[in-house]
């Protein structure tokens, strides 16, 4: 298994041939198959003797890959898709071939140095001080959880007798905040948004002050959302930051999708207040054109995160010095250098190219909204703020939305699953792929 034989060399050529073809070609949309269906075709792929590299690659390329929806298809506008740059995808091959460990500076100094430069760019465009720092983790769920654990540790120092800890967030906050609260065994204070559907400081202040005055529960973190998954709305971060500072509460910004807009001049004003965050996350695998999976987690004062997350054991003592070890800043020890493909693409293309590509998603959303507003069967939920457009089909039941979505995928036109807003079924386009065109949008709208 560990010798580079002629068979391995042939397999390497086949892998590269497939990878290059996948990068050069228009991506297929494809779609899922049932487990029973896949098993009927493939049987058990794990055998005592093994299938051999050539045959196993064939199993993947001819069957398994086709049973996965391509997130980079230009008409995959579901959830928050992904559109990695060609450079980032190619460099992911290099990372995989290099056996790099990204948990410590001692073992991965060069790779960690590069990751930190990509993090530094995010810190700079957010407006945090140069002393801020961060780490790439698996995704937004792990990033939010890691930051909130640090926030609670800080609150414990000043309020050791608190009965129950509480996270204050919007009723529209991402599901990962609820997940973090469950894992941490803390409560959620879900606060209604204002008439613009934004969480603001006034609403949060009222809710927190009432909670603190009437219970022995205490809010240890306020979570603002910078680009909600459903509608792409940016909370009033500036007023949230003031409310948090006045009450000595940690301010965390979940920007997994939307904080990529920091590099787009046309919407930069929406993020006023993020510079006052104690921590934030943004996922390069969403709108910054990196492959899965990479979430950038940033702390204003990273030494606080190091206090919380550094693991101690006799076999780890050699790592405990002043060098920057990523394992000290989140809930992980073993980690791949998942930020490297993002760093490579960012370094190679330059930040101007990123600004242009993000602006393209914003333009697509605005132009699509105009088409939807003019469509006799459709109605906008609201004007797009970032790159998500939400709308309804007049007269449809929830079942009809789902039937349309299923048929669209079956016909390989696109992947647009329905969502919900205010209890009603909606459709939404999430534009993160610069290859999506208005012709693609029109093709989908023609089916409505």
Mark where each language-model region is.
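N-terminal entrance/gating region of PLP-dependent enzymes' catalytic architecture
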Residues: 1-131, 412-414, 425
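Short loop-beta-helix segment that forms the pyridoxal 5′-phosphate
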Residues: 122-146, 191-192
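A short linear hydrophobic-aromatic micro-motif
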Residues: 132, 219, 376-380, 413-418
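Conserved PLP-enzyme active-site core in the AAT-like
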Residues: 142-306
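Active-site C-terminal subdomain of aminotransferase-like
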Residues: 228, 272-373, 383
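Conserved PLP-binding catalytic core of the aspartate aminotransferase-like
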Residues: 379-408
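Conserved PLP cofactor-binding pocket of PLP-dependent enzymes
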Residues: 383, 388, 411-428
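PLP-dependent enzyme catalytic core of the Aspartate aminotransferase-like
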Residues: 421-448
């Amino acid at each position: 298994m560990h010798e580079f034989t002629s068979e391995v060399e042939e397999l390497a050529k086949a892998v590269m041939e497939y990878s290059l073809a996948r990068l050069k070609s228009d991506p297929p949309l494809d779609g899922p198959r049932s487990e029973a269906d896949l098993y009927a075709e493939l049987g058990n792929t794990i055998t005592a003797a093994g299938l051999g590299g050539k045959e196993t690659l064939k199993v993947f390329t001819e069957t398994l890959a086709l049973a996965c929806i391509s997130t980079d298809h230009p008409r995959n506008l579901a959830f928050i898709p992904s559109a990695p740059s060609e450079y980032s995808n190619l460099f992911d091959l290099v990372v995989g071939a290099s056996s790099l460990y990204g948990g410590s500076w001692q073992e991965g100094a060069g790779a960690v140095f590069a990751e930190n430069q990509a993090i530094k760019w995010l810190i700079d465009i957010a407006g945090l001080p140069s002393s801020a720092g961060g780490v790439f983790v698996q995704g937004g769920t792990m990033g939010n959880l890691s930051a909130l654990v640090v926030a609670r540790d800080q609150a414990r120092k000043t309020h050791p007798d608190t009965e129950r800890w509480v996270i204050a967030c919007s009723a529209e906050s991402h599901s990962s905040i609820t997940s973090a609260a469950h894992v941490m065994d803390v409560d959620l204070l879900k606060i209604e948004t204002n008439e613009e559907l934004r969480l603001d400081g006034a609403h949060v202040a009222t809710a927190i002050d009432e909670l603190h005055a009437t219970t022995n529960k205490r809010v240890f973190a306020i979570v603002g959302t910078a680009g909600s998954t459903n509608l792409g709305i940016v909370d009033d971060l500036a007023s949230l930051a003031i409310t948090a500072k006045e009450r000595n509460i940690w301010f965390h910004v979940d920007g997994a999708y939307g904080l990529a807009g920091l590099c787009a001049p046309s919407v930069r004003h929406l993020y006023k207040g993020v510079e006052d965050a104690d921590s934030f996350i943004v996922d390069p695998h969403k709108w910054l054109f990196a492959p899965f999976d990479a979430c950038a987690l940033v702390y204003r004062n990273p030494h606080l995160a190091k206090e919380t997350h550094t693991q101690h054991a006799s076999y780890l003592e050699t790592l405990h010095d002043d060098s920057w070890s990523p394992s000290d800043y989140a809930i992980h020890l073993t980690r791949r250098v998942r930020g490297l493909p993002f760093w490579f693409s960012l370094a190679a293309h330059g930040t101007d190219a990123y600004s242009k590509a993000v602006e393209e998603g914003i333009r697509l959303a605005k132009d699509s909204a105009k088409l939807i507003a003019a469509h006799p069967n459709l109605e906008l939920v609201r004007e797009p703020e970032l790159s998500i457009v939400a709308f309804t089909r007049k007269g449809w039941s929830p079942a009809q939305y789902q039937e349309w979505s299923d048929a669209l995928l079956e016909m390989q036109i696109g992947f647009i699953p329905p969502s919900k807003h205010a209890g009603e079924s909606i459709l939404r386009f999430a534009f993160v792929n610069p290859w999506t065109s208005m012709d693609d949008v029109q093709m989908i709208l023609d089916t409505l």
